[in-house]
Amino acid sequence: MIAAILLYFIICMKTPKRLLPLIEDGIVDEVLGQLMSGKEATVYTVRCGSETRCAKVYKDAAKRSFKKAVQYQEGRRVRNSRRGRAMEKGSKFGRDQQEEIWQSAEVDALYKLANAGVRVPEPHGCFNGVLIMELIMDGDGHVAPRLNDVVLSPEQARHDHAVVMQDVIRMLCAGLVHGDLSEFNVLIDDVGPVIIDLPQAIDAAANNNAKDMLERDVRNMTNYYGQYAPDLLKGHYAKEIWQLFQKGDLTPDTKLKGIIEVDTRPADVDSVMLEIKAAFAEQEERLKRMAEND
């Protein structure tokens, strides 16, 4: 009995506080070590039964250094009106609800993108601000490296760039934009790129920043791969994707050419001026009617 109690206290001393409830509930059996610490979370390797997985512990809002979080939260739907009002007022309850939405956004995005055919870690649930998910491994059974730690040949860079662009397209077709995609948020396993870190993923239709964020995501990835294959830098991939998306012509299987359609027709200045004059005339008429009614 004493030995069991002593063992429990040793486990508690070694285990991060936020992971203790998961151990007590049997969700996690053992914390194996810290994998990395980033701007919005700390990631641990954990044992869950016979499997080794990741436990992503989100940092409190006050400790997170993620810039301009409000831009990412725009358009996120809150079904409960009480929660929505509380979040607008900034009450403690509202802040707690905002935090819960931020933490659940990643697991929701992972499920959605996996169903859309995007290569992301398999999620196993989010428990009190801790996301349990698949640990991505390389062909030798080691933790998969990030893209920025891998040296590529020009051929491999072109191939992997095309793979990532296809995943960006599938994400957009599923209604999401990553919002923080770079060589630091892509892992490389024995199959190829795996996209990670999605708590800031945004609703492409509801967020006014979607186009700018998509362009930044694509630019980041193209610039990185372009170090190894400079010909990629000549492509207009972001504009091509968004152009097709706006037209309703983008599908999960769309193949990019890196070329955009440019309207070379001369501007019809006369028609534009007529529309402006008509608008002014309509406004003057409206003001005249208002004055007559006074």
Regions found by a protein language model. Give the residues of each.
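Conserved ATP-binding subdomain of kinase catalytic cores across diverse folds
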Residues: Y8-V143, C173
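Regulatory N- and C-terminal appendages and interdomain linkers associated
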Residues: M1-S37, E155, H159, V163, ...
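Catalytic activation segment of kinase domains across protein kinase-like and atypical kinase folds
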Residues: G49-D60, R146, S182-Q227
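Catalytic-loop of the protein kinase fold
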Residues: C173-G179, E183
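A glycine-rich phosphate-binding loop feature that marks nucleotide/adenosyl-phosphate handling sites
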Residues: G129, N185-I188, Y237-L244
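Residue-level preference for long, well-ordered alpha-helices that form the structural scaffold
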Residues: E99-W102, F127, S153-D160, A210, ...
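AlphaC helix of the protein kinase catalytic domain
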Residues: H142-L152
